[in-house]
């Protein structure tokens, strides 16, 4: 097997999947930081963000990782990050005040592009559309409604989202239903010929639901673990060619329970049809991504799983804990990030 990157800490974990060996190469570890935001621009450039004001960047595929200070925000929790290049990135500080910052010079300077001082405000995740202009940020309920704001200029300015006047506002939820800021992946902006622009959002808590936040055309209960403060959906990814999505979650307080933690979604004429995998992931999972129409990766505090059949069966390849996994938007590199300042690269055969 080829070695694509230099191992910074000299630590590689070898795993087997379908008779083939994978490697999880730990690139960074040991800091008192929990990474939950991760954005991989290409095979060379990625950014990550997390607790205690942590922002890091690599421009050489992880050979070196630069810790970038954000003056005045050293104690903030940056739960999500969206990067556009080695120089441009947007970070989200979750709560009171909720703040979004943008850099265009590789983190030398940060500009505040959004702030909300509303009591109880808690931002959960961001997503950016393929045009790199349209963006959305979502947050927990304020006065009975999930918070959502949009940007049409690549995050330079934001305004609160309002639903179409003729449709029911699917943002209305009980106080016991919200979103999990576990990996910045509970929201997905898509644009499909069959059903136009949609904003797929998953929730948890007392109810786990899949919502179309933009068009307000569905607000469906998910056949997955729910009912408690630590249960529900955490992450969604969508594959356009197959018109399908995969949702993962479970119970982060009981992270080894391997049931009711994954839902497969097939969209028929714009409406979701749910099914469960034959073999689910092996515990609570906070993030899921498609590599292609058939291959997916999911991770959480109790391990990493891979599927090669569209999410129907999952194989545990590691019990290592990670919060988030992302693939290069342009390229093939796959990186993971999690607690204790851990950043790793997953190398597939």
Per-range role (PLM):
Residues 1-23:
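Bacterial Sec-dependent N-terminal signal peptides
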Residues 22-349:
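Residue-level hotspots at or immediately adjacent to binding/recognition sites across diverse folds
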């Amino acid at each position: 097997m080829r070695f694509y990157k230099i191992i910074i800490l000299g630590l590689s974990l070898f795993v087997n999947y379908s008779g083939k060996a994978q490697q999880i190469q730990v690139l960074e570890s040991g800091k008192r930081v929990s990474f939950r935001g991760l954005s991989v621009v290409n095979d060379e450039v990625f950014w990550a963000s997390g607790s205690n004001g942590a922002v890091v960047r690599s421009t050489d595929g992880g050979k070196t990782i630069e810790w970038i200070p954000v003056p005045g925000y050293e104690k903030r929790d940056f739960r999500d990050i969206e990067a556009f290049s080695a120089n441009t990135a947007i970070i989200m500080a979750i709560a009171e005040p909720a703040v979004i910052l943008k850099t265009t010079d590789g983190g030398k300077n940060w500009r505040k592009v959004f702030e909300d001082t509303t009591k109880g405000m808690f931002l959960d995740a961001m997503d950016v559309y393929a045009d790199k202009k349209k963006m959305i940020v979502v947050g927990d309920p304020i006065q009975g409604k999930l918070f959502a704001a949009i940007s049409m200029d690549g995050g330079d300015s934001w305004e609160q989202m309002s639903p179409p006047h003729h449709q029911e506002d699917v943002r209305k939820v009980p106080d016991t239903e919200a979103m999990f800021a576990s990996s910045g992946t509970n929201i997905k902006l898509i644009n499909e010929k069959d059903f136009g622009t949609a904003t797929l959002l998953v929730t948890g808590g007392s109810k786990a639901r899949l919502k179309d936040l933009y068009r307000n055309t569905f607000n469906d209960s998910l056949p997955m673990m729910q009912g408690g403060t630590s249960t529900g959906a955490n992450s969604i990814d969508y594959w356009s060619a197959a018109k399908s999505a995969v949702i993962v979650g479970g119970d982060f307080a009981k992270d080894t329970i391997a049931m009711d933690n994954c839902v497969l979604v097939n969209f028929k004429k714009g409406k979701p049809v749910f099914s469960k995998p034959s073999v689910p992931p092996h515990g609570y999972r906070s993030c899921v991504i498609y590599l292609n129409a058939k291959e997916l990766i999911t991770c959480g505090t109790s391990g990493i799983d891979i599927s090669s059949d569209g999410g129907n069966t999952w194989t545990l390849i590691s019990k290592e804990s990670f919060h988030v996994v992302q693939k290069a938007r342009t390229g093939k590199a796959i990186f993971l990030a999690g607690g204790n300042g851990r950043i790793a690269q997953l190398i597939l055969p």
